[in-house]
Amino acid sequence: MKLLITGGHLAPALALIEEIEKTKKNIDIVFVGRKYPIDREKTLSLEYKEINKKNLTFVSLEAGRLTRVISVSSLIGIFKIPIGFLKAFFVVNKYRPSHIMSFGGYLALPIVFWGYIFKIPVFTHEQTIKPGLANKLISFFSKKIFVSFDEVKNNFPANKTYVSGNPVKPSIFKIWKKPFEIKKDRPVIYITGGSLGSHSINMHIKKIIVSLLHRYIVIHQTGDTKEYHDFEDLLNIKNQLPKELQSRYFLVKHFFDDQIGYIYS
């Protein structure tokens, strides 16, 4: 059996892979994702690093998408939509998976479309409370749709939608590696915008980090998007703080699977 996994939500995808590796030894997994998080950058994406650590097949795919904001980059994205569909055809045709599991997003849409055309069973998972346009389109081609929350069901056809919850990696309940040592003498706040980070969250934290550090230990996962230089800007802010406050501020670009358990411990 060959399973092709694709989509924008990395954490539940990794949780599924971890469960498959533990219980199903005869499944060949192919992961279709972005090698670089943003087209203009050459920083390797977290999904590429994680999948390669697991020695699984990683196929890089670039695809365009529709956005609500009109700009030069959004227009380029529109022109890349047919190119993405063409590339996705060759991916699906080459690997011919027996099943496709989508975790949503613009990258998954062309893969799911061709899976449907090739009569490959497609399944999708919606992680968030408000489905995006891509997942609404993907739902049409899907045999079954899994959602994290009961209130999301109304966004999809009732006859093939199931509340599964959000897949969670068992690794977060175990301490495999300590990325740093925390002296837990006060409450801990973990700030994250997901694998890519969140520029808007990072911008807000820049304004309030000093006041937070007077009362809390802060673990801040910024992401590694070179377009905004958030990690570098926040590192500069940290270096200008008094030593006592610096010792309470743990700044990282991202955490790997074997590190996240310590954060939640």
Regions found by a protein language model. Name each.
Residues 46, 147-154, 223-226, 238-239:
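Short, polar loop motifs at secondary-structure junctions
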Residues 10-22:
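Short amphipathic alpha-helix
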Residues 37-42, 177, 182-265:
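Donor-nucleotide binding loops and adjacent catalytic segments primarily
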Residues 21-22, 49, 86-100, 107-123, ...:
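Glycosyltransferases and closely related glycan-assembly transferases
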Residues 2, 57, 116-176:
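Active-site-proximal region of nucleotide-activated glycan assembly enzymes
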Residues 63-99:
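An amphipathic, basic-hydrophobic alpha-helix
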Residues 87, 132-134, 258-262:
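Short acidic active-site motifs
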Residues 5, 26-76:
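Conserved nucleotide-sugar phosphate-binding/catalytic loop shared by glycosyltransferases and other
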